A protein has these predicted regions:
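P-loop NTPase switch module centered on the Walker A-proximal segment
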Residues: 1-98, 102, 142, 210-213
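Conserved short loop/turn motifs at secondary-structure junctions
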Residues: 8-9, 125-133, 168, 174-178, ...
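Short glycine-/polar-rich loops that comprise or flank the Walker A/P-loop
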Residues: 67, 90-93, 118-122, 156-159
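Conserved ATPase-coupling elements of RecA-like P-loop NTPase cores
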Residues: 79-84, 102-109, 133-137
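Accessory interaction regions appended to the cores of large information-processing enzymes
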Residues: 140, 160, 180, 184-191, ...
């Protein structure tokens, strides 16, 4: 029986974990044609490559010195915590990967805490030591202090450290002495990470993740915790609430390099993919046919945010997307629920809408962006934070926020966060930059990142993670400026936009199709202003001077999806289609809007 090591990689967004896995595959000669080896093999989802983040956990295996190493790539962002907890169930050890300059970030802390609670022993990899002004020795001390504060055992605190640069393709035990490859890391994994415990008995496998194939349907992925599974064997699927179903395994596959290989039998401790099970959910157990014993199901953190999803009912409905009806939207959300553990969906206030609950703005915006690329047209409302009643008191989610920024912007950043009910916990200098830590309500984070980046000229590095629930902190003032709302449907005209420049900043360029009720800019004052930017210049038979037709407009403000979701007010929606993104009022007609607001005020 082949020796196995199961290891998960923990790292913050963009600290280089996917690059490191690529190097491990390269080293183990798994990529057949090395010259054609692309970068970031693991981030196979367009969104993941663009944003430089890993959203879905993926499995890869490499064979080194005759030992099979199953590497599980975890998402680094706490918004995808649902993925993280499942993945750690499959691993026996973890690689903690940190940036030699940035050190441990809040998201790393979130996943590390989960790993320590589960008793996993880490191997610390300090990456990017080729960067200027890196501080590997200080970072190692920081990681030790962090693990101590998270309640790690003595054995866990006695961790091994490997330094290197995944991008340049080397790892060594001393960062001042670069090596030629990453064998130092692979050897350390074999020494430190324990082999999986082999438990004899009837088979048991906990389904930890799910893959989908257009040919065979849903595939269950998990680790065999006891006994062995064989292709064609009859099993019992143990679901929640003591429900049991008799099922047959059609095919068994193990992870081989980047792909999968069919096998007849999978032994205890290996990670495999099972084809042929129907109606399973993540957290179910594949058990013995005659004497089924269920494993405890996976616990996942609760959602902290909700958002209204509804069909696109704007005047431009159906022009750009393929899937535009509420039936399409419902089917897509139900499909997402099968593999996205931290998501919940409930019916909305009317038949065409749904309330979707998730872990944060990033979690939900990734779903919206994926749907947009698949050809969906939809509209989404302002994100709302979910409160809880604990001991008869209204409580709200509190996040731990860290900001790294140049010294000259510290005062401005502290003022912006405290205005949103944030409390400064820690402040320390790191060279020419300052590290700030705050506790802040989740709702205070909406729109904060874009404002901080503007105030610090793009220099701030912002990260946050859920800390827990605390009593409600009071009202937070939201965006103070009103919107510039279009009165007409038609093409935007430079002539009329030029005349309205002093009233605010625009989100669109001249010559763009707009409709009545679309938010086309931000007003300089508090209330909304209805404007007509479709008005053209009246032609006369008088000859105009040459300077008259030269209009100078500043470039429009362009939002990313997250920024748009954080920017909109309660009476606004974001319209998302495959080709464009627009902000609009829920009620498009100006007279109806006024009537509604006067009824509300009465």
């Amino acid at each position: 029986m082949q020796e196995i090591r199961n290891i998960a990689i923990i790292a913050h967004v963009d600290h280089g974990k996917t690059t490191l896995v690529d190097r491990m595959i390269y080293q183990a000669r798994q990529a057949r044609e090395q010259e054609k080896l692309g970068e970031l093999i693991l981030d196979n989802n367009d969104l993941e490559r663009e944003r430089g983040i890993t959203i879905l956990a993926k499995n890869v295996s490499v064979v080194y010195k005759g030992v099979k190493i199953n590497v599980i790539d975890t998402p680094g962002h706490s918004d995808f915590g649902g993925e993280v907890e499942r993945v750690l169930n499959m691993a026996d050890g973890v690689i903690l990967l940190v940036d030699a300059f940035e050190g441990c970030m809040p998201q790393t802390r979130f996943v590390l805490q989960k790993a320590i609670e589960m008793g996993k022993k880490p191997v610390l990899v300090i990456n990017k030591v080729d960067k200027l002004n890196c501080r590997p020795d200080e970072v190692q001390e920081e990681v030790f202090d962090l693990m101590f504060s998270l309640g790690a055992t003595e054995d866990q605190l006695d961790f091994r450290t490997v330094y290197g640069s995944a991008k340049q393709g080397w790892m060594s035990h001393d960062w001042r002495e670069p090596a030629s490859d990453i064998t130092a890391l692979l050897d350390t994994i074999l020494e430190v990470v324990p082999a999986p415990e082999v438990v004899e008995g009837t088979p048991q496998m906990l389904i930890s993740s799910l893959e989908y194939s257009p040919y065979v349907g849903r595939i269950a992925v998990g680790r065999v915790t006891r006994g062995s599974l064989k292709a064609g064997m009859n099993t019992t699927l143990c679901k929640r609430y003591d429900i049991q179903q008799k099922q047959k395994i059609k095919e068994l596959m193990v992870f081989d390099g980047l792909g999968k290989a069919k096998v007849e039998e999978v032994n205890c401790g290996d990670i495999c993919a099972v084809v042929g099970l129907e109606g399973f959910e993540i957290g179910d157990t594949v058990a013995d046919f005659e004497n089924p014993e269920a494993l405890p199901p996976i616990e996942v953190d609760e959602p902290t945010m909700s958002m209204l999803f509804c069909i696109n009912n704007s005047p431009f409905f159906g022009k750009e997307g393929k899937f535009v009806t509420s039936r399409h939207l419902k089917e897509r959300l139900e499909k997402e629920l099968e593999k996205n553990l931290a998501l919940r969906v409930k019916p909305g206030p009317n038949a065409d809408s749904f309330i979707v609950y998730g872990r944060g703005v990033l979690h939900l915006s990734v779903l919206i962006e994926t749907m947009r690329r698949e050809g969906f047209e939809l509209q989404v409302g302002q994100p709302k934070v979910l409160d809880k009643v604990i001991g008869g008191q209204r409580c709200e989610p509190i996040e731990m926020l860290t900001i790294d920024l140049p010294e000259e912007f510290v005062g401005r950043a502290i003022e912006m966060v405290t205005r949103r009910k944030g409390a400064l916990i820690q402040m320390e200098g790191r060279g020419d930059r300052t590290h700030l830590e705050f506790d802040i309500p989740s709702r205070g984070l909406m729109g904060l990142r874009s404002n901080l980046l503007t105030a610090t000229q793009g220099e701030a590095v912002v990260a946050h993670r859920l800390k827990g629930y605390e009593p409600y902190k009071g009202d937070i003032e939201r965006r103070t400026n009103g919107s510039l709302v279009s009165l007409e449907t038609g093409l935007s005209v430079a002539y009329s936009m030029d005349k309205l420049q002093d009233r605010g900043r625009f989100f669109i360029e001249p010559g763009v199709e707009i409709y009545e009720g679309q938010v086309v800019g931000e007003h300089t004052r508090e209330r909304d202003l209805n404007i007509n930017i479709c008005k053209t210049k009246k032609l006369t038979n008088m000859r105009a001077s040459g300077s008259d037709d030269k209009v100078m407009l500043p470039p429009p403000i362009v939002f990313s999806l997250e920024e748009a979701l954080e920017y909109i007010q309660e009476d606004e929606l974001v319209e998302v289609t495959p080709k464009s993104m627009r902000l609009r009022k829920i009620i498009l007609n100006e007279i109806e809007r006024k009537r509604k607001s006067s009824d509300f005020n009465c």
